[in-house]
Amino acid sequence: MRLPLLLLCTLLLSGCAARDQLPDFSASVGHDLPATHFQAVIYGRDGTRLSATVFQPALKAGATAPVVVHTHGWGGWRVTRPNSFYGTQMMSGRAALKAWQAGFWVISYDQRGWGGSAGNIEMMNPDYEVQDALAVIDWAAAHLPRLSMDGPNDPRVGMLGESYGGAVQLLASAEDRRIDAIVPIATWFDLAEAMAPDSHLKVGWTGVLLGLGLSTGYDLGKFVQAPYLKS
């Protein structure tokens, strides 16, 4: 019984695995682009391997579209496919799929240390998570066809995500002018105040966040270090 179950899980997970090889877009030149999605590997600026799902919109021949970068919350993962948990049960995942269906490119990626991405969780460190988000934009500009561009290596970009995924938008948009719009949902400005407003600890939420962090082996001591308390 265990062997068939293991094989089934392996097959299901293989369908969500990111891969380096991209679809051949050359055949679509001068033709309509069909709506589809595929898994991809994007490398952060420090070489960290990030797993991503790219949702390709239906586009008429010659038409272009902006890209929406979707970032998940603490303890979450990317939208791996249209009927995935994050795509059907989480507000930001549903919004990302709505954007895709409305004709936008969408890239949903696992932030470092979460899901299928390598690296360690650095709690929104500008040198790591923020640079990863900018690397996703670099990748989109270099690899996606029919992308609306505002200039060389400057795609028209929006960002969407909740909580932890909202914080990266605030920091990334302050650093990179290529980001044209952000939708940070239920994120924080001052993490200490968010977790313990007026020194009253939110026991429920803090317990959930700490539990999710422990499950990854994350160094929870960073939660109380000054550089990590404010975005």
Could you describe each region identified by the protein language model?
Residues L13-G15:
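C-terminal motif of bacterial Sec signal peptides marking the signal peptidase cleavage site
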Residues D24-A63:
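N-terminal cap/lid segment of alpha/beta-hydrolase-fold proteins
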Residues Q89-S92, Q101, L160, L171-S231:
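Accessory cap/linker subdomain of secreted extracellular hydrolases
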Residues A17-R19:
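Bacterial signal peptide processing site
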Residues L59-A63, E122-Y128, A135-S163:
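Gly/Ser-rich "nucleophile elbow"/oxyanion-hole loop immediately N-terminal to the catalytic nucleophile
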Residues A61-A65, T71-A102, I107, R112-A118:
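Short substrate-entry loop that stabilizes the transition state in hydrolases
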